[in-house]
Amino acid sequence: MSEAKRLAAEKAIDYVEDGMIVGVGTGSTVAYFIDALGHIGHRIKGAVSSSEQSTARLRQHGIEVLDLNHTGNLSLYVDGADECDPNRCLIKGGGAALTREKIIAEASERFICIVDPSKQVPVLGKFPLPVEVIPMARSLVARQILALTGGQPVWRDVVLTDNGNVVLDVHNLQITDPVALERSLNQIPGVVCVGLFARRPADVVIVGGEPPRVL
């Protein structure tokens, strides 16, 4: 699938215009996008990064990393996904960067999601749903998620997010109404961010292949 990821990432370069500040996500597919962006880095003003990992890779390519507080809204955000449904709703957060990813997506006029074909699903939920949680609320949130959804929350106990929080991965879900579930989980005290991108889905999904498909 690495070739499909690369092809999707390189297709996303078509959406980058001269003088842009580009929002950049996190993950293995985005790494290919950053590498491709490095070839045209002289054409853009810089990037806003969703993780320390992506920041380091951008700087390796000589791309200036800017603070979202100073840039205002962005024209373009490019990121991957763990799952994508036919409505371009996503599960994200396998790399534990979901909160910053959601912030940048919200601040961007256009969200381009780059995936390999294995990420396309008819219904979200086979991939465990990440939920970023304040550490002291971990058990409380897990109990409430279990009661609300029937899914099984599992603490990703070797991981802290870049924000210093923990991640619960919710297994055994079949998410037929992603917008409603995103809204409900966000109401639980202690939840920082839910890895459902449904209220603000992708505007365009690029599926890697020969040739890439644009949805």
Curated annotation (Swiss-Prot):
Catalyzed reactions per annotation: aldehydo-D-ribose 5-phosphate = D-ribulose 5-phosphate
EC numbers: 5.3.1.6
Annotated active site: E101
GO CC list: cytosol
Any one GO biological process: D-ribose metabolic process
The keyword Isomerase is annotated on this UniProt entry: yes
Xref: CDD domains: RPI_A
Coiled coil: none
Entry-linked PANTHER family: RIBOSE-5-PHOSPHATE ISOMERASE
Function as written in the Swiss-Prot or TrEMBL entry: Catalyzes the reversible conversion of ribose-5-phosphate to ribulose 5-phosphate.
Subunit relationships: Homodimer.
Family the UniProt entry places it in: Belongs to the ribose 5-phosphate isomerase family.
Entry protein name: Ribose-5-phosphate isomerase A
Record organism: Xanthomonas oryzae pv. oryzae (strain KACC10331 / KXO85)
